[in-house]
């Protein structure tokens, strides 16, 4: 029973990774445009900016493996940080979104590790 649950989780993670591999980073101009639309409450812009950066969250999450949480849990925490960054990003400051978002992604992962991770 436990092995089956683990396999289902691994299959779900594999499917998720397969789905997001086609996402491409956005040009800075597009990020700025989306940030303005997000500030105006455009949910589609919020989704587009987030989806374009899901693969980056996975790459950051992989750096924190073997610290007490599964890769899926790390990705989930990183995605929460990504959404905070999406909501707070100001494209007028001239920064690339990912340079801003990486701090929120790492912070969310570190918080999850502190709260839920276990010492090895």
What are the residue ranges of the model-derived segments?
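Alpha-helical promoter-recognition and RNA polymerase-docking modules of transcription initiation factors
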Residues: 2-120
């Amino acid at each position: 029973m436990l092995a089956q649950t683990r396999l289902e989780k691994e299959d779900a993670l594999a499917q998720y990774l397969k789905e997001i591999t086609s996402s491409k980073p956005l040009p800075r101009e597009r990020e700025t445009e989306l940030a303005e639309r997000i500030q105006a409450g455009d949910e589609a812009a919020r989704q587009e900016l987030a989806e374009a950066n899901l693969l980056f969250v996975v790459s950051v999450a992989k750096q924190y493996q073997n610290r007490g949480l599964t890769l899926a849990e790390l990705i989930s925490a990183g995605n929460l940080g990504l959404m905070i960054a999406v909501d707070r990003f100001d494209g007028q400051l001239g920064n690339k979104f990912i340079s801003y978002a990486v701090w929120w992604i790492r912070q969310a992962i570190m918080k999850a590790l502190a709260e839920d991770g276990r010492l090895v």
